[in-house]
């Protein structure tokens, strides 16, 4: 590990010390709480949508969330380790077979829906 990677790892540890980032993947519906500063006031704004892309680049990791706002598609890119992110909550797991869901940009209505991923418990775990 070179010096730059080591410094980035230390910075990631420092930024995630007071918050936890849940594991999520493209296709998941997430609620991202963002700190918004308006003049002297600071408030938390919730942004809910489907993760259409995730970019894993260490400290520069980011993800794109897409939602439909009053009939218009809105996409927002978030830096994963940004201090402006208050929290991330996974609302629903999506079952997709692609890493980048850019094809959802051309879809609307029912064709833009994503199937929910169902998780089953194993018999050994259920017996205990």
Swiss-Prot record:
It comes from Ralstonia pickettii (strain 12J). InterPro entries: Ribosomal_bL19 (IPR001857), Ribosomal_bL19_CS (IPR018257), Ribosomal_bL19_sf (IPR038657), Translation_prot_SH3-like_sf (IPR008991). The keyword Ribonucleoprotein applies. It comes from the Bacteria. Belongs to the bacterial ribosomal protein bL19 family. PROSITE patterns: RIBOSOMAL_L19. Keywords: Ribonucleoprotein, Ribosomal protein. This is Large ribosomal subunit protein bL19. One of its GO terms (molecular function) is structural constituent of ribosome. The keyword Ribosomal protein applies. Coiled coil: none annotated. GO terms for cellular component: cytosolic large ribosomal subunit. GO terms for biological process: translation. Gene3D superfamilies: 2.30.30.790. This protein is located at the 30S-50S ribosomal subunit interface and may play a role in the structure and function of the aminoacyl-tRNA binding site. SUPFAM superfamilies: Translation proteins SH3-like domain.
